[in-house]
Amino acid sequence: MIAIRSLIPVLLVLGLADVCRAAEATESSALAVLASGAGVHEKARACQQLAVVGGPATVPALAALLDQEPLADYARSGLEAIKDPVAGEALRKALVRLNGRLLAGVVNSLGVRRETAAVPDLRRLALDPKSGVASEALASLGMIGTGEATKPLRTVLGDGPAELRVPAAHAALAAAAQLAKDGNLVDARELLGCVVRALPSGHLTTAAQRRITALRADPAPAVPK
């Protein structure tokens, strides 16, 4: 029994090594498919595989597809899932060469990743009426939910275009939840107050007011170290 127990760590290490080698092989195979003359279905499947096993080496191949239909969404989803910061950088760089639906998708992915480095770019898009993705940029700023990310939300709620105030309110509710989770209760309440003041009475203002009341009653949560 003792001998068997002593083998367990060795077996675990060997098993982990096998898993890593398999992942590397899958990544290499998927990248080879993207570089080949394979069909759309095969390349889409390769993008999906890279979302699971891809690392920094995967990023250039996926980034090159962000403006190419019908693979752009598959490539974007792959980059969205890769944890390495270079994936977020690739998405940010793509903002200047995309428009329409493809631009909106990348904006959304930056929010899902909570890319704080993208806040200046998202702010520009949110406050530019000609960007075509102002609502999407506001939503992503809400998902990021840092103090800096909430500044454009406050701007729109304060004196922004009327058609953007509802999207900004939705984003502010999401951002307030993140601020509260991070222990920034005062900032969360102030942001929710902006929602209450910006809109006529309705479900969004009711939700904001209820959350303000709840935050006043809740003790400050411990901020994760």
Enumerate the language-model features and the residues they cover.
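N-terminal secretory signal peptides that target proteins for export/translocation
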Residues: 1-4
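Boundary at the C-terminal end of the N-terminal hydrophobic targeting segment
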Residues: 20-25
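Structural detector for internal amphipathic alpha-helices that build alpha-solenoid repeat scaffolds
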Residues: 36, 41-55, 64, 72-85, ...
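Acidic, Ser/Thr- and Gly/Pro-rich intrinsically disordered linkers and low-complexity segments
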Residues: 31-34
